[in-house]
């Protein structure tokens, strides 16, 4: 699908979609426990892949309107009858890999061409060290993966610098292992807030995990029960309409943004630091951004990788130079997001230098161009925001990928008055 964006002001209000990260975890934790009633989930391509995978493990999942009810497997997943296709969802693949390690038989995972390029080596090693048998069919650490249970627990170490999803995966499944588990983190734990989200939800479900974030200690033979759970709004998705207000000198309010463990709430601090006017009514769950005179800043993206495409566009529209640092792990997402943003913003006239772990961006005037969305929802949405600030028209390919996390994205832009054709 092609999207065409013309220079526009944006005014008004929209609600943030439900959090993709919380929804994935609610489905996985609900499926591994006794029962869950999840209200206000994000039902998108990615999260529905997790629903399908958990059904394959034996969870009874029923979707009705704005509610998902789950009768879980209580730590004893069955062996799937067929290959599990995680589609484009790295979260599905990684969270469910550890679930597969509890099944008394072999599970096969695959995914689309993008997912089959994403690294899983540290998780494969961890599952093997815990007593399961796990390997990549091509020996590359990428899907297709074959996983045979049952993991027993034990003491392992895992690299924390590639993806925090590896750690979240183990935290969800290791409470059901036959022995206690200790996980030692090697190097910096990148994207730590996502692990905090996992721990928050497991604690609500009654699971006991001790940690200082360098070491995780998990008691064996537990079970848990998520019960009733409401999914919060997604700050990652909200970053796009908020940034749209900032780069066009407009005013936008985004609702359904209450305080939570989401690290991507840091977008509000970054907007303030760059010169936008930001007001967050935490009780009402509304964030209002009014564009100001933006200027470049230095940003550490180590804990907020999903904000990098948005931050790159803000930087492109700001005066001076912005340095986005500590972001090498952003290369291992649906696409290499550092390279993708550098490549596409250059087409729009932006001076941008790509480093192994970041971007140096000189702000200036943007010109509409034909750009590639790289089949990546965050690249597409970030480029759409850039198109709102660019002279002329911007044409974006693979626009359908927004269905992964924000299906109503283009409709919401239109609601705010943007000139959008899809």
Swiss-Prot record:
Annotated residues for binding of phosphoenolpyruvate: 20, 90, 118, 165, 337, 378
InterPro entries: Enolpyruvate_Tfrase_dom, Enolpyruvate_Tfrase_sf, EPSP_synthase, EPSP_synthase_CS, RNA3'P_cycl/enolpyr_Trfase_a/b
Alphabetical UniProt keywords: Amino-acid biosynthesis, Aromatic amino acid biosynthesis, Cytoplasm, Transferase
Known EC number: 2.5.1.19
Annotated 3-phosphoshikimate binding sites: 20-21, 25, 163-165, 191, 306, 333
GO biological process, one term: chorismate biosynthetic process
Keyword Amino-acid biosynthesis included in the entry's annotation: yes
UniProt GO molecular function: 3-phosphoshikimate 1-carboxyvinyltransferase activity
Pfam families listed in its UniProt record: EPSP_synthase
Reaction equations catalysed: 3-phosphoshikimate + phosphoenolpyruvate = 5-O-(1-carboxyvinyl)-3-phosphoshikimate + phosphate
Subunit structure: Monomer.
Family named by the database record: Belongs to the EPSP synthase family.
Job description of the protein: Catalyzes the transfer of the enolpyruvyl moiety of phosphoenolpyruvate (PEP) to the 5-hydroxyl of shikimate-3-phosphate (S3P) to produce enolpyruvyl shikimate-3-phosphate and inorganic phosphate.
Name recorded for this polypeptide: 3-phosphoshikimate 1-carboxyvinyltransferase
Organism of derivation: Methanocella arvoryzae (strain DSM 22066 / NBRC 105507 / MRE50)
